[in-house]
């Protein structure tokens, strides 16, 4: 019963905060929880959900390449500017940090609770987004802003 109330509370907070992604996620999890054999579905999502999410984000990132909005010349151009190099470095850093983070979660599963709670707080109250590659652009923003502040 506690999990139902917790999920409903998250859905309510998401609704009040007008966070559509978290609202949809909590309603979907509530709906899945109501299904017979939900333990199997939840177990599968728990095991494969991050990979599924990363796959969907990767597809989204590749769409501009497929539509021709981004081409090989754009990739080459990214190596010619400091912003391009910074973007590449931030992407590498996020990939490495993510792999270390997954290792930490596997070693200390109790960290997951704090991460989930922190993510919910960030998404709801700070208008954040629970997404991995987006973090790279956020890190890039911080680095660029810091760099620009020291230039003036």
Swiss-Prot record:
The chain crosses the membrane at residues 4-24, 52-72, 85-105, 115-135. The keyword rRNA-binding does not apply. It comes from the Bacteria. It is a multi-pass membrane protein. InterPro entries: UPF0756_TM. One of its GO terms (cellular component) is plasma membrane. HAMAP family: UPF0756. PANTHER family: UPF0756 MEMBRANE PROTEIN YEAL. Belongs to the UPF0756 family. This is UPF0756 membrane protein EF_1246.
